[in-house]
Amino acid sequence: MPLIDFDHVNLRTAHVAEMSEFYRTVLGLEVGARPAFSFAGAWLYCGERAVVHLVEVAEQPNPSGELRLEHFAFRARGFDELEQKLRVAGIEYRVSKLFGTEIRQLNFHDPEGNRIHLDFPDG
């Protein structure tokens, strides 16, 4: 049973609206259709796929600040455009290059501290 592709990341949050806005404005994801679950939340889409699922919880998960998820990653295009967007928004980020390749990487955090890693295969 080989893996085929990345499907989605599921994040628990007490701030669904703020997190939705971040993923919409910074990464360009679109809020879209979501099944009628018995709990509140939002699904954010990259094209036809809901890649970020937000699940509303009463209080912020893991109040100690210790993250259980190290990072999640997307492939992307438009390195310069996104770097400028992060700079203008005042979002701290780190640029790196994947050793032995032309892949540039951007790493930054969403409003709740989850690390987002973007690979730009076109350098």
Sequence positions of predicted segments:
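Active-site/binding-pocket entry motifs
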Residues: 50, 58-60
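A short, compositionally biased micro-patch
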Residues: 37, 47, 77-79, 99-101, ...
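Vicinal oxygen chelate
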Residues: 1-2, 6-14, 42-45, 62-85, 88-123
